[in-house]
Design a protein with these regions (language model features):
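N-terminal Rossmann-like NAD(P)+-binding domain of SDR-like oxidoreductases, especially those catalyzing
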Residues: 1-157
């Protein structure tokens, strides 16, 4: 089966929208965007027949993607991404960044799909010494740690 699709979580946010533009111009892939619109916007949608927008949460990625065998890569940008607000909305941050990301990781692992994950200077900056400065930085650093272990345990790519 030809893998001719990519998934972008957070596809209606700044990074996701710009990646969609790049993929439209440089590839032939069909693109599926999953976004809960907590920070992304429908006004960022690109009107192109190769792009499909799905309103949904990354926690439900296995239900939202009907035919994972056609997916070549998941670009995972759909996380809670506000440092200051992560103190005010800690449950939302953990749900999105830990539970939602874990669902994306498991979806990719189970279906042998390549994952591109977006790290952050909030957990990598200052030689990693800032990884516990906020709930946001903590969740991102734990995700990086989990991905390193998944790579060792399961040869996850």
């Amino acid at each position: 089966m030809i893998k001719n699709k990519v998934v972008i979580t957070g596809g209606s946010g700044f990074v996701g929208t710009n990646l969609i533009k790049l993929l439209i111009n440089k590839t032939k892939y069909k693109i599926i965007s999953i976004d809960d619109y907590s920070s992304g916007s429908r006004s960022n949608h690109i009107n192109n027949p190769r792009v499909k927008y799905i309103k949904g949460n990354t926690v439900n990625i296995s239900k939202l993607i009907k035919n994972p065998k056609k997916i070549k890569t998941v670009f995972h940008f759909g996380e809670f991404a506000r440092i200051y607000q992560s103190f005010l909305k800690m449950n939302e941050c953990i749900s999105s960044n830990s539970v939602g990301s874990n669902a994306v990781f498991n979806f990719c692992l189970k279906n042998k799909i390549k994952l591109i994950y977006s790290a952050t200077s909030a957990s990598l900056g200052n030689k990693g010494n800032d990884k516990n400065l906020s709930p946001y930085a903590f969740t991102k650093s734990k995700n990086l740690e989990l991905l390193e272990n998944l790579k060792k345990w399961f040869n996850f790519k």
